[in-house]
Amino acid sequence: ASIFVNTAVSNEIIADINELSFPLGVISLAVLPAICEEVVFRGIVMTGYKKVSPFVAIMISSLFFGFMHQNLYQFSYAALTGVFLGFLVYFTNSIYASVLAHFIINGSQVVATKLALMDNSQAIMESLKEPLSKSDI
């Protein structure tokens, strides 16, 4: 069960993502989020709180990053990833390092998802559509 997002909505998102071609999936789920999210969370938020302390800046930007991902599982994973990315920026003094790491994390998930769905894509898409027809969306 999800705190912020209905599971049927999550299933619909997965089904939509599966419809993307591999290059479009990499661009829309790995390249663009890596650049945009890092500019916002490590570039703007973390830099803004750095005057308080680097640790506080990393923690606040990580919490915002976690909340932006919308459900409890994603929050936990994203917040911890945000801490890693924040320390990466802090120790390298470069947002490029966190953009690259973010791209590798998201890109590897796109590749893994596409590989996992290759053999079973039709069966998986049908199982995802079943809860959608029974949901209250």
Regions found by a protein language model. Give the residues of each.
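Juxtamembrane helix-loop-helix connectors linking adjacent transmembrane helices
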Residues: A1-C36
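Hydrophobic alpha-helical transmembrane segments
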Residues: P23, I27, F55-I60, F75-S76, ...
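Membrane-interfacial alpha-helical segments at the cytosolic side of multi-pass membrane proteins
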Residues: V31, R42-K51, V111-D119
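Alpha-helical transmembrane segments of multipass membrane proteins
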Residues: V31, S62-F67, V83-F87, G107
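Active-site His/Glu-centered metal-binding helix of metallohydrolases
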Residues: I35-V40, I44-V45, N71, I104-S108
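Membrane-interface helix/loop boundary segments of multi-pass membrane proteins
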Residues: C36-I60, F87-S94
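Small-polar-interrupted transmembrane alpha-helices in polytopic inner-membrane proteins
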Residues: S53-Q70, F103
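C-terminal membrane module of polytopic membrane proteins
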Residues: I104-I137
